[in-house]
């Protein structure tokens, strides 16, 4: 199963999302500190990221952008309770900060809390001005797969594809869903679209090709996909699962 995607922090522009009004100079200093912290987060330098965030928090102790960035640092360093606390502080300060909500939902997903993550992703998708909305629909679909809700997952992936027709993960998962529903023609169509945007197929992409070939009795395609999966990804869970299935 695919992992959900985290919304990337902007590199240099910070929208003020804090508590008390401040002077332009203080706001500029705050934005500079947050931007530096984000750069350090991007390269995995957690100590310098925290140092700059602490300095930013001295300027504005109730800034949602700072809370969110702290949350990502703590999540990356395995301090999950602190990460959750910081995510919740960010959303309490600015409930409309959809990037933070998306990243909190991704955090919940990574902790196996799929029902909670689904609710947060669903809220994110309601923000029609959020640039990461296609990704939020994708993540919502992945949540629903984990919750054994294929119809809901398909609805979410369809919305994601309506906004981004080249979303390889949504195309792939729609192929699996259509195959499981017995619609091999649609499964082949989605797999073909996936191959167009991802010529170097993932193990899961090759597995879908295998399963479609198996379902349609296409022995040539079956042999080709099995050979590719064995040669390219011999240690992958997909190849092991396929070989175990063949030995039954």
Residue positions per predicted region:
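Bacterial Sec signal peptide processing site at the extreme N-terminus
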Residues: 6-29
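Terminal, low-structured helical/coil segments at or just beyond the last alpha-helical repeat
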Residues: 16-24, 193-248
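Structural marker of alpha-solenoid helical repeat scaffolds
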Residues: 25, 59, 92-94, 127-129, ...
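Canonical tetratricopeptide repeat
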Residues: 35, 69-72, 103, 137-139, ...
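Register position in tetratricopeptide repeats
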Residues: 42, 76-77, 110-111, 127, ...
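TPR alpha-solenoid repeat register
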Residues: 66, 100, 134-136, 170, ...
């Amino acid at each position: 199963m695919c992992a959900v995607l985290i919304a990337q922090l902007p590199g240099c522009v910070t929208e003020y999302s804090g508590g008390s009004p401040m002077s332009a100079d203080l706001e500029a200093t705050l934005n500079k500190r947050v931007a530096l912290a984000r750069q350090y987060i991007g390269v995995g330098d957690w100590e310098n990221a925290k140092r700059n965030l602490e300095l930013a928090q001295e300027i504005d102790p109730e800034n949602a952008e700072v809370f969110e960035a702290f949350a990502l640092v703590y999540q990356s360093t395995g301090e999950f309770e602190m990460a959750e606390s910081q995510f919740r502080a960010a959303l309490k300060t600015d409930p409309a900060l959809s990037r933070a909500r998306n990243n909190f939902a991704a955090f919940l997903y990574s902790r196996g809390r799929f029902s909670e993550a689904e609710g947060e992703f669903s809220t994110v998708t309601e923000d029609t001005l959020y640039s990461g909305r296609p990704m939020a629909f994708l993540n919502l679909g992945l949540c629903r797969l984990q919750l054994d809700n294929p119809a809901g997952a398909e609805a979410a992936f369809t919305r994601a594809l309506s906004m981004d027709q080249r979303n390889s993960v949504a195309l792939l998962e729609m192929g699996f869903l259509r195959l499981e529903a017995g619609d091999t023609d649609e499964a082949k169509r989605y797999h073909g679209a996936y191959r167009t945007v991802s010529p170097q197929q993932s193990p899961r992409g090759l597995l879908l090709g295998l399963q479609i070939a198996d379902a349609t009795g296409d022995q040539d395609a079956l042999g080709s996909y099995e050979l590719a999966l064995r040669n390219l990804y011999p240690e992958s869970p997909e190849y092991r699962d396929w070989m175990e299935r063949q030995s039954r």
